[in-house]
Design a protein with these regions (language model features):
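A short acidic, often aromatic-flanked loop/helix-cap motif at beta-alpha or helix-coil junctions
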Residues: 108-115, 160-162
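Alpha-helical substrate-recognition element adjacent to the catalytic core
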Residues: 11-111
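Acidic, Mg2+-coordinating phosphoryl-transfer loop and its flanking beta/alpha structural elements
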Residues: 124, 131-162
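Short, solvent-exposed polar/charged micro-motifs at secondary-structure junctions
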Residues: 87, 111-118, 145-146
Length: 162
């Protein structure tokens, strides 16, 4: 027997949301080079385009995105990264074969200090139809809690108490 495309089921939701840092991208090396002697993160270094290249691909999560994309789902990446890093981010996504239909990033002019869970809710409200979201994949506890409070099935791919 053959298995048909799961997304061909009538009335099925068709959008899958992925977080980027800590979910699709493993950021340990970038965090290491961006940490000040006092232990605090230097956000300028952390979001420096050169340092973004240090990120490692989270292969199981990227494979999940590839499989869903092959099945016809819309892949949307919601990221707390500044839109000033969009070129470096798109380059990293391409190099690591991460499929996506839409990349939505933090507006560096208006959202600089917006907490990520508020930012992601705003991104959802302004850019997507919540009724079309099939699944969310994220790592951060506060953001996972937001998605689940909205009734969205959410896979948490890493410890996210930060």
């Amino acid at each position: 027997t053959s298995v048909g495309f799961i997304s061909n089921i009538k009335g099925m939701k068709n959008t899958i949301i992925f977080d980027l840092d800590g979910t699709l991208a493993l950021i340990d090396k970038r965090r290491e080079v961006s940490t000040k002697p006092n232990g605090k993160l230097d956000w300028g270094k952390f979001f420096n385009s050169t340092n973004i290249k240090l990120d490692e691909p989270n292969l199981p999560v990227i494979k999940m995105a590839q499989l869903f994309s092959e099945q016809g789902f819309n892949i949307v990446i919601l990221s707390g990264r500044s839109n000033k890093t969009e070129t470096a981010t798109r380059s990293w996504l391409s190099k690591n074969k991460v499929p996506f239909n839409k990349l939505i990033m933090r507006n560096s002019e208006t959202d600089h200090f917006t907490p990520d869970w508020v930012l992601k809710k705003n991104m959802l409200d302004e850019n997507l139809d919540i009724n079309d979201v099939f699944l969310v994949v994220d790592d951060r506890d506060r953001v996972v809690k937001l998605w689940r409070s909205l009734g969205l099935t959410t896979f948490q791919v890493a410890e996210g108490n930060f």
